UniProtKB/Swiss-Prot annotation:
Name listed for the protein in its UniProt record: Small ribosomal subunit protein uS2
GO biological process: translation
Gene symbol of the encoding locus: rps2
Species, as recorded: Methanosarcina mazei (strain ATCC BAA-159 / DSM 3647 / Goe1 / Go1 / JCM 11833 / OCM 88)
Family indicated by similarity: Belongs to the universal ribosomal protein uS2 family.
Keyword Iron-sulfur part of the UniProt annotation: no
């Protein structure tokens, strides 16, 4: 099983929607704990399904490795990090928040997140210099950034680091977390997983800010 070189996080998949869920994978959530949605909903969305590669950065979020070599993420950690990220985002002016996704299945959820909260979004191919060069069309210097995949959005992380803007990232088991300030451990490749995570983030930020939120999770799901 491949391991990538570790990089410290700055803070103090394979088929993802057709993989059967083992009963004991719900054990990663503490019995009797209150999660943002039911554990069954997290499992059904495949949020816990990682890849067959892992990095040292992400090992602390891994619940177990399956017999087929697939790493399974800890759902309780995912739930907790969504809460932490939502609380952090609620302290920012939405117009100063930037959500980024080059990954196909992340673009619609990110767009809906932006629409629900009134944030900025950069979707699809990221134009180098968009955060650092005022001469670039669409230049924007945000106060905080959310990225869908540190690998696919690597240029965004590089530019954010150069200008000192904090980054929240959806990270799978194969991701490195250098230049990431807050990791949300999740399947960041699956259509349903991405829609659920972005929907929960938008819902929780709205709740914390006492603003209306009239969206269902299916509104965030990329159409087939």
């Amino acid at each position: 099983m491949a391991e990538a070189k570790p990089a410290p996080e700055k803070e103090a998949a394979v088929k993802t929607e057709s993989v059967p869920v083992a009963d004991d994978e719900a054990a990663s959530a503490k019995e009797g704990s209150t999660s943002l949605v039911s554990i069954d909903e997290y499992l059904a969305a495949g949020v816990h399904i990682g890849t067959q590669q892992k990095t040292q950065d992400m090992m602390r979020f891994v619940y177990r490795v399956r017999t087929d070599g697939l790493y399974v993420l800890d759902i309780q950690s995912t739930d907790e990090r969504i809460r932490v990220a939502s609380k952090l985002l609620s302290h920012y002016d939405p117009s100063r928040i930037l959500v980024v996704s080059s990954r196909q299945y992340g673009q619609h959820p990110a767009r809906m997140f932006s629409r629900a909260l009134g944030t900025r979004a950069m979707l699809g191919r990221f134009i180098p210099g968009s955060l650092t060069n005022p001469q670039i069309h669409g230049f924007f210097e945000p106060d905080v950034i959310i990225v869908t995949d540190p690998a696919g959005d690597a240029q965004v992380l590089k530019e954010a680091s150069s200008i000192g803007v904090p980054v929240i990232a959806l990270c799978d088991t194969n991701n490195l977390t250098s230049n990431v300030d807050l990791v949300i451990p999740t399947n960041n490749k699956g259509r349903k997983a991405l829609s659920l995570v972005y929907w929960l983030l938008a819902r929780e930020v709205s709740r914390l800010n006492n603003t209306p939120f009239n969206y269902e999770m299916t509104d965030f799901e990329t159409p087939l």
